[in-house]
């Protein structure tokens, strides 16, 4: 019952904060709980959800290439402009951070920070015009900060 109340609070905050992806995901989980399907589906989602979500996200990012809207020349030009090089470097860094974050949340099991990540995403969507896609990068920054802090402290 407590988990349902927490999900309803997250749903309310995400609707008020216009964090539609968080609201939709929360509704999905609440429906699964109402149908008593959570005992079967939650373990599968917890094990495979990030991977499946990443596949869909990457496929949507690759569509311009698959549609022929990105040419070989455009890809080559990435390496000849300062903006292209900067975008490539930032992408390398954020992808690295996402990997750190995924490892931190899943393999290392630090799910206790998830409420703070969700709350931060909802607040940023509501008041800063943000889009709540950053929990992996956020947890990656946390993991990187902890790595640096541990190196400095030892």
Curated annotation (Swiss-Prot):
Top-level taxon:
Bacteria
Record keywords: Cell membrane, Membrane, Transmembrane, Transmembrane helix
Annotated signal sequence is none
- Where is it predominantly found? membrane
The record's annotation in HAMAP family points to:
UPF0756
Please report the name of this protein according to its UniProt entry: UPF0756 membrane protein CKR_1028
| A Gene Ontology cellular-component term | plasma membrane
Give the transmembrane ranges. Answer: 5-25, 48-68, 82-102, 113-133
For this protein, the record's InterPro entries field holds: UPF0756_TM (IPR007382)
Q: What subcellular locations does the record give? A: Cell membrane
Membrane topology designation:
Multi-pass membrane protein
Give the family per the record. Belongs to the UPF0756 family.
Q: One Pfam family name from the record?
A: DUF441
């Amino acid at each position: 019952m407590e988990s349902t109340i927490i999900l309803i609070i997250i749903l309310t905050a995400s609707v008020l904060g216009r964090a539609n992806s968080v609201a939709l995901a929360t509704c999905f989980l609440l429906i699964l709980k109402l149908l008593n399907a959570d005992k079967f589906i939650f373990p599968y989602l917890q094990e495979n959800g990030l991977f499946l979500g990443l596949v869909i996200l990457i496929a949507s990012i690759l569509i311009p290439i698959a549609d022929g809207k990105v040419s070989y020349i455009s890809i080559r030009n990435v390496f000849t402009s300062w903006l292209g090089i900067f975008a490539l470097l930032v992408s390398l860094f954020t992808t690295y951070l996402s990997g750190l974050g995924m490892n931190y949340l899943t393999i290392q099991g630090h799910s206790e920070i998830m409420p703070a990540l969700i709350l931060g995403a909802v607040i940023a969507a509501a008041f800063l015009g943000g889009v709540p896609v950053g929990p992996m990068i956020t947890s990656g920054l946390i993991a990187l900060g902890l790595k640096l802090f541990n190196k400095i402290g030892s």
